[in-house]
Amino acid sequence: MKIRFAILAGLLVVGLLSGLPVQAQQAAGHVERQKGPASRSTAAVTIDLAEGGRIFVGDEIRTGPGARLQIRFDDESMLTLGENALITIDQFVYAPSGDSSQALAIAQGVFRFAAGQIGKLAPDNVALETPVAVVGIRGTVFLGGELTVGMPAGQPHYGF
């Protein structure tokens, strides 16, 4: 009798909890290309990234030593991060026929950003915050961070 009561009580609790609303993460984009270690963190969970992996609003993205990461957002904007970069996806809302906005906080590292549809449709609604400035979109492509370029003989190449 006690076992039957415990089982019924457990099933009741599971049934009640299953009715609670679960907040889904809002997708923002995916990993287009990756070289080296990179991860995304949300609250207390850290997940290693891989090509094709989804990126969500609220994610903190971190690249490791020697790493490069390219993120394609759902509006076709592209963010390329160099090694030891740290950014947060603060906001991403893409509605081709409505209000759209994108906000990224770049805490450290080298980055390159090419605006997508949000930058074309609502350039005032795209912002990238760095430790020393907030960048608003007036053009479409810019590079930030510290970068040293050498030009040895041969064909120059920066990227993957």
What residue spans do the PLM features occupy?
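Bacterial N-terminal signal peptides
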Residues: 8-18
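Flexible, surface-exposed loop/linker segments and immediately adjacent secondary-structure boundaries
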Residues: 24-160
